[in-house]
Amino acid sequence: LAFVGTAHSDRFALIQKVYKLIQSQGLKCYFYLYLQNWKLFFWHKFKNPAFRKAHLKDFHYKALAKNELFEVIKKSRTILDIQHPKQSGLTIRTIEMIGARRKLITTNSNIKEYDFYHPANIFIVDRECPVIPDDFFKMDYHQVNSDIYYKYSLDGWLDEIFTTLL
């Protein structure tokens, strides 16, 4: 299980819970929590209760390069996606995982409404009390219809835009 992203809102607290859960299941994980600088860490520690138990070493202060991110995704079977609590749509990480054909664990309960959703590929986790069944990790990735992969690709998106405009 891998997570790469900016440490905002309740992400740090949720990552800590998921880390303990994954460790108890004997699974490998890689979490890269990014903050723009160490001053922001102290601001969050003061203002955000989710950061109260955080330490400077829990975060990275240099963004992961795109080629490093791609390497993390390539080496991972499952990616953790934690949307901002006020976000209702899909994250870019979700779209990336469709293209990468990777399993996704997400806090976005609306994802069930999308045509690419399949329970073997996507598990919705409760951000307050995360539970991820062992079976989800053991299931193979289920290939979805090629039309769906195309729809969420850059080419598919451009076709949709230009077809609508013409």
Where are these regions (language model features)?
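Conserved donor-binding/catalytic loop of nucleotide-activated donor transferases
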Residues: K74-S76, E96-R102
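Nucleotide-sugar donor-binding catalytic core of glycosyltransferases
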Residues: L1-Q87, T91, T106-I111, Y117, ...
